[in-house]
Amino acid sequence: MLLSLSAANVFAQSSLIATLSHEGEITAFYGADALKEAHEAAAHGDAITLSSGTFSATDITKAITLRGAGMQVYTINNVLPTLINGDFTIQIAEGVSEKLTIEGICHLDRISSNCKLSGARFIKSRLGRVSLAYFANASFLHCKIIEYMYLEHSDCIFNNCYVADCRPTNSSSQFYNCILVDDGDGIGLKDLEYASLYNCILIGKESSSGDRLPSSCVVYNCTGVNCYDATCFKDVPIALNVEQSIFTDTFKDYTGIYSDDITFELTDKAKKWLGTDGTQQGIYGGNFPYDPTTSNPHITKCNVAAKSTADGKLSVDIEVAGVE
């Protein structure tokens, strides 16, 4: 494969780097705007890989695969996270056959979209505020959505995710082995219209009478924690094998206040509350037990020489860590 270098921002020390893979050729871009520059040069179906570090956000108008080094704020196998700073939109033209995939990023600002997009995937990413409209067959795997999730005229599947304040409007959502949270700001469990929940743990606000799921939901093998009147399932017509619990009986390290280092591991008692498939409820059960480690190799270091050699060559040292 060929490697070409964008010389706009090269440094003697370790650099931010985005690599663009297009038809077998790899192009590297450097600096905080590397993601923006790589996206401008990309075509539908291309892949952009980001190193650890903080990149400026850019609107996504192409169905690309965007991969980061990971979402965690602490190190995973000595790999720091990839952070994207600033709001961005997803506006991909209708009818594009390629699919959008976003994996291994930390983005705490707002992602919004109202384009008709099918098959988008969000994997192993920590997201702040997400607002999607007209998304079909979108999927979220091993994600943490820590502020809110708005869905309008969309259908999405969530596997082994933490989702705060989810509000689907004219949407159909399926949640498998997820943790869903009502943080008490007026949006929460009562807004989960037409949702199907399997093997999930629902966190309510004890002081709020709005913690009950709407009657349009179907619920299988789920547990409600800290819910008003001891039940969030009261109005649900189909609610099979549901439990009620409190924080200390359910989680080892979570008491209702989110922080990045909380594992959401269950207590020994809670591990006995099995889902429909015989595994534990929550994010560590099911067919896809939660694991924040990304599936792609990580760019862990990029050193670029300050000067070229006498024959015009520029020394570039890129270190890539494979998945263990």
Give each language-model segment a name:
Residues 65-113, 126:
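Right-handed parallel beta-helix/beta-spiral solenoid domain characteristic of secreted/periplasmic
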Residues 102, 108-114, 127-260:
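Predominantly extracellular beta-rich ligand-binding scaffolds that present long acidic/polar faces
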Residues 18-56:
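Acidic Gly/Asp/Thr-rich repetitive segments characteristic of extracellular carbohydrate-active
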Residues 238-293:
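C-terminal accessory segments
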Residues 44-65, 69-75:
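N-terminal extracellular ligand-recognition/capping segment immediately after the signal peptide
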Residues 279-314, 321:
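Short, compositionally biased P/S/T/A/G/V-rich stretches that sit at domain boundaries
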Residues 53-54, 69-73, 224, 228-229, ...:
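Acidic glycine-/aspartate-rich tracts in secreted/extracellular proteins
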Residues 1-16:
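Bacterial Sec-dependent N-terminal signal peptides
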